[in-house]
Amino acid sequence: MGANHARIYAGMNAAKLVATADLDKDRCASIAEKYNVSTYTDYRELLEREKPDLVSIVVPTASHMAVAMDCLQAGVHVLIEKPITSTLDEAGAVIERARSEKLKLMIGHIVRFNPAVQELKKHLDAGELGRIFQIVCHREGPFPTRIRDVGVVVDLAPHDVDIMRYLSQSEPIRVYAETERRIHTEHEDLLLATMRFKNGITSALNINWLTPTKIREINVLGEKGMFQINDLTQDLYFYENSLAVNGIWDSLKTIQGVNPGKMVRFAFDRKEPLEMELTAFVEAVQNDLPVPVTGEDGYEALRIASALVQSGLTHQVIEL
C-alpha cells in the first residue's frame, strides 16, 4: 500500500515526492531507483533530514500512534491509513496532538473517494431515493498476509461503518455482531453484524477474510427503490420501485408493497480512489481547507468497530 502512495505522490503536479521510509531495505532500494528519491529505514531520520510538509503513514496499525505523534511533533501534516489507531485512547491522543499543533490530520477511508460512492451521495442528497430504509455492505475476500496485528473487524469494518455514517448522515445507536475465528486463530476472521441508526435506518455488514474471491458491494434500500454499488468495478445501479416513483405507494403498499420498475446504470468518470484521496489531502494542506475525512471520523469508525468486537465476544447488543 505504501508503494501506491509513493506512486501517486510522484505523479502529482501539486506535490513532490521527496523521500520514503521502510524497514525493508529491498523495498527502499526499489523505490529509490523507481522515483529517484531518498529512502530511509528510520522514518525519524527522514523527518529530521527532509523536513517534509506532509506525510502518509502506511504502517501496521499497532504503530500508527507512535509514528503519527512523531510526525506531528515535527510539524508535519499527517494522513493515516485506516484505522486511525489500535485503540480509542490512542486515537484521542493523536487527534488532540494535531489540534494543539494546528496541523491537518486526515484518515484514509478510501471508499469515500470511489467515484461510484460520490455519485451515489449526490443522488441521496437530492432525495432521489426518498426515505432510506437500510444500508447493507459486503466486504469479503481472502486473508491478506500483510495483516498480523488486528482482526477483520478493526481492519475492514471501519471502511463500511464510515460509509454508512457518510451516506446516512446519522450515527448508530446500537450494534449486534456475531464473529468467528474459523482459520486465523489469533483474531476473528468473520463478522456478521446489524446496526440501528438514530434516524431509523438499519444496516447490515457481512465481512470476512474467508471468501476465495473479492466481493465489495454497497446496497442502499429506500422508498423509491435501491441503489447498488460494486466497489471493485466502480459501477452504480438504481433499481426502481415503480409504485413509489409513480405516486401510488400509499394506496397500494398494503397489497403489493413494491413493484419492479426500470434499472439504470449510471455513467460517470472512473478514477483511482487513492489518487482522489491524496489529491484532496494535498489541496487541504496547500489551501488551508478542512480535510474531507477528519480524525473525529476515524475515531467514530474505530469506536463503532470496537463495539462490534465487544458484541461478538459477549454475544450482547451494545448501546452506543
Language-model segment annotations:
Residues H5, Y35-R97:
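Beta-loop-alpha module in the N-terminal Rossmann-like domain of NAD(P)-dependent dehydrogenases
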Residues F113-Q134, V154-E180, T194-I201, S311:
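Oxidoreductase and adenylate-handling cofactor-binding alpha/beta cores
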Residues L54-V59, A280-L320:
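C-terminal helix-rich "cap/oligomerization" subdomain common to oxidoreductases
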Residues V161-N241, F268-K271, E275-L289:
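Contiguous beta-strand/loop segments that form the cofactor/metal-binding neighborhood of enzyme cores
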Residues A19, D53-L54, Q134:
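Short, Asp-centered acidic motifs that coordinate Mg2+ and/or phosphate
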Residues M1-Y35:
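N-terminal Rossmann-like dinucleotide-binding module
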Residues L79, T85-I147:
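A contiguous active-site-proximal alpha/beta segment in oxidoreductase catalytic domains
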